[in-house]
Amino acid sequence: MARKGILGTKLGMTQVFDENNKVVPVTVVKAGPNVVTRIRTPERDGYSAVQLAYGEISPRKVNKPVTGQYAAAGVNPRRHLAELRLDDEAAAAEYEVGQELTAEIFADGAYVDVTGTSKGKGFAGTMKRHGFRGQGASHGAQAVHRRPGSIGGCATPGRVFKGTRMSGRMGSDRVTTQNLKVHKVDAENGVLLIKGAIPGRNGGLVVVRSAIKRGEKA
């Protein structure tokens, strides 16, 4: 079955009860409505993909090139525009320009991958950023308790290797959490209740796609 996807907004976390009266932590995602603005095919573009637009925005805030893209599709401008790759041309044939996608593309119990931008933490040390254990708390350790330690020899190699884990800015990265279960689809309100936590802040843009590793499960 072809992978499905939709753009949405993370609203926050809450908890609900399942059929066994057990508490289930869920993230509430406002999913869609999305509108299809373009369909890419192997013959014309070299690959299969669908372009989705989501979110309200004043037309005066959209520049002319982007406005032209929306005009060609015959839809009003949206705040977010994203392209989702498809498996093949047959999957692309399931979409048409101007089509509207809502939360109903997913079913209760489906497994999804959720992509978002993680919260920014600012400049962080190695213990917080990479999980270093730090230096000893006693036995002669003085004012080095949270330092990373050696990052390389003076003469050999005489440089710091690329990729060495050091202090730096943490967060604000594109993160995907895989194999999350859709606990409930609220079609009336266009909301997905996804079991567990997803990346990003409340109000942030997320992409919800069918799980690539285990597929859908009704």
UniProtKB/Swiss-Prot annotation:
SS bonds (residue pairs): none
Family annotation (PROSITE patterns): RIBOSOMAL_L3
Keyword RNA-binding: yes
An annotated GO cellular component: cytosolic large ribosomal subunit
GO biological process, one term: translation
Similarity comment: family membership: Belongs to the universal ribosomal protein uL3 family.
Biological function: One of the primary rRNA binding proteins, it binds directly near the 3'-end of the 23S rRNA, where it nucleates assembly of the 50S subunit.
Subunit-level organization: Part of the 50S ribosomal subunit. Forms a cluster with proteins L14 and L19.
NCBIfam families registered for this protein in UniProt: L3_bact (TIGR03625)
Descriptive protein name: Large ribosomal subunit protein uL3
